[in-house]
């Protein structure tokens, strides 16, 4: 069995990043409106993939399911590092 020592490159476009940001904003606001802790609910969804963590209010559940969880996590990491001076 051959091993692949090359680093794989993963990237998606700026438009997709903005779409994910808008989706997260809508989901966050919907969770707050329902009286849930938005951070806990979003983390629950990202870890489990279970859409039941996200309400149907404002179409939040359908919106978040349009994105792969790894893309959402990538955008969260990018935003965190950018806002904490660690990356461009």
Swiss-Prot record:
Disulfide bonds: none
Any Pfam family: IreB
InterPro entries: IreB
Family named by the database record: Belongs to the UPF0297 family.
Record-given protein name: UPF0297 protein Lreu_0534
UniProt organism field: Limosilactobacillus reuteri (strain DSM 20016)
Species lineage: Bacteria, Bacillati, Bacillota, Bacilli, Lactobacillales
């Amino acid at each position: 069995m051959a091993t692949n020592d090359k680093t794989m490159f993963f990237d998606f476009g700026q438009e997709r990043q903005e779409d994910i940001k808008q989706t997260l904003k809508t989901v966050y606001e919907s969770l707050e409106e329902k009286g849930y802790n938005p951070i806990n609910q979003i983390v629950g969804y990202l870890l489990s993939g279970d859409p039941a963590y996200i309400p149907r209010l404002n179409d939040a559940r359908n919106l978040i399911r349009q994105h792969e969880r790894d893309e959402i996590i990538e955008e969260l990491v990018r935003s965190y590092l950018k806002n904490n001076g660690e990356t461009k």
